[in-house]
């Protein structure tokens, strides 16, 4: 950013450039001019160039051109920099959400999954260690390197932490129960098929656990993975247990994304085969 732009921005907050300061001398064009103080020439501290003495705004401009801002050191110590997302009007205008700054040393970091990011695989997502920002969508090659190797395991088995898997399954069951337990005449047929007074029927809960094993990896693919999976279950249940169409604009948008079409198809096929065989298909998938 040029010095002229900076001086103009600073002068905009004070009086206009070119108005005289005290003592009849030209005022500074920048912040000093805004306060109405006399230019450096009035006090005899102008800048000499070519044997002459430049006063007022000319002296300030000469000093500005010759000044070099000292380099700021990054935060030391074991904790290092603490980054926060830059939230400004220009970032919002251009949709920039990957710019971070350390408030202490003013060091900037572009968190876009590039070489400066320290990427950590948390099991649920790919996260930059410096900012905590999820960068999985920006480092496709890196993700493929880690995910494609165990693609079959991720599609057919729960996460490494089985307790986490069960917790996710229970959360989905509660949300599915809440969704279909509403006072909606169009959902009455489905409520009778999948709900009891206190929750989902046991066989429905078991089907959710079995089919979740082929969709659990979506959590590492999308920032809204949980919502996508819940939407998948809503569509699967409606398509199987309803004899009439009850879709609306608020339901299930993930079929518009081809990446999830194959996952949805596998979930529905596994749901149907497990329901028909009494769990044999689910046991085979778990193996």
UniProtKB/Swiss-Prot annotation:
Ranges that cross the membrane: none
One Pfam family from the record: Herpes_UL92
Region described as Disordered: 13-58
Comp. bias regions, Gly residues: 20-58
Domain of life from the UniProt record: Viruses
InterPro entries referenced in this protein's UniProt entry, alphabetically: Herpes_UL92
Family the UniProt entry places it in: Belongs to the herpesviridae UL92 family.
Protein name: Gene 31 protein
Chain's gene name: 31
């Amino acid at each position: 950013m040029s010095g002229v732009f900076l001086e103009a921005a600073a002068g905009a907050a004070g009086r206009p450039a070119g108005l005289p300061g005290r003592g009849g001398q030209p005022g500074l064009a920048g912040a000093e001019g805004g306060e109405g103080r006399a230019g450096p020439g009035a006090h005899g501290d102008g800048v000499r160039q070519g044997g002459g003495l430049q006063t007022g705004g000319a002296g300030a401009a000469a000093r500005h051109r010759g000044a070099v801002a000292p380099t700021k050191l990054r935060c030391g110590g074991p904790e290092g920099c603490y980054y926060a997302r830059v939230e400004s009007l220009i970032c919002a205008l251009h949709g920039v959400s990957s710019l971070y700054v350390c408030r202490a040393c003013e060091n900037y970091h572009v968190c876009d999954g590039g070489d400066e990011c320290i990427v950590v695989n948390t099991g649920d997502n790919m996260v930059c260690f410096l900012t905590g920002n999820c960068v999985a969508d920006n480092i496709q090659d890196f993700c493929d390197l880690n995910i494609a190797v165990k693609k079959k395991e991720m599609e057919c088995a729960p996460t490494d932490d089985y307790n986490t898997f069960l917790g996710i399954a229970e959360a989905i069951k509660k949300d599915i129960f809440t969704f279909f337990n509403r006072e909606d005449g169009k959902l009455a047929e489905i409520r009778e098929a999948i709900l009891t007074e206190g929750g989902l029927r046991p066989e429905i809960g078991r089907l959710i656990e079995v089919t979740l094993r082929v969709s659990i990896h979506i959590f590492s693919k999308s920032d809204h993975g949980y919502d996508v999976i819940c939407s998948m279950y809503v569509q699967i249940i409606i398509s199987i247990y309803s004899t009439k169409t009850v879709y609306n604009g608020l339901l299930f948008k993930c079929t518009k994304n081809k990446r999830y079409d194959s996952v949805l198809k596998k979930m529905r096929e596994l749901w149907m085969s497990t329901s028909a065989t009494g769990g044999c298909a689910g046991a085979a998938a778990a193996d």
